[in-house]
Amino acid sequence: MSESFYTYKCGHTAKYEYIKPDGAKTQSFTLVYAHGFCSDPYGRKPEEIRKWCIENGMGFFRYEIAGHGSDAARFEETTINTYKSQIFEIVGEMVDGDVVTAGASLGGWLGLLAAVQFPQKVKGFLGLAAAPDFLKKYFEAYFRPEHKEILERDGKITFPTNDFTYVITKEMIASGNENLLLDKETIPYAGKTRLLQGMKDASLDWRTAPLIAQKLTGSDVKTVLLKDSNHRLGSDSDIAEIRRALDDFLVPAVHPGR
């Protein structure tokens, strides 16, 4: 795997991998994969998506979101606007040709923002437990008065988990509120969309996926609810569903008779 470092206009430097489409394909796209919050682009899902792209001659672009991975030391400096600027630069300037954005959790929010921003270039969107507006929902559901007091006083609050400790800043929450999608009557994107969502997701209300589908202005939208799947969507059966969803983005000539 060939990775490089890139310094984005937002000032953050992070790793990315860009595999261009097979030149023999008359019609192709590059799938831009955005990972989840406090995660990275190297887990099973992106590896399987990468494999699918190579098998089908499609391009593949994955990257570390600012403040994550090799840039983790600068996490507290980042906001949703930082992440949005980054994916807009990737889709708008770094990747040639047509794009399908794919995102897990936070990455789904970013991929959808990019689809709305570049509707002519982004031909499709794949949401994997896509979590638009998750900061607002998290703030409303879990922030008790004492949390809000700490946030107001210190400008940030620390949350320890079993795996890691992360910091939420006032700027992060404010920027999330500047980029809400689900509070709008419609999400102005008409491209092909596939949404996969586990119904045993402990991090995200599974009804988020049907709500996204309802608000999208396009008609080629499918939502797959996986009754026994969790937020990670990393089981063998989940991966099989992801591959089936990816197949839907291939041009008809690739699968005659469909």
Language model features with spans:
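Gly/Ala-rich beta-loop-alpha elbow adjacent to hydrolase catalytic centers
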Residues: 103-111
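Short beta-strand element of the alpha/beta-hydrolase
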Residues: 27-36
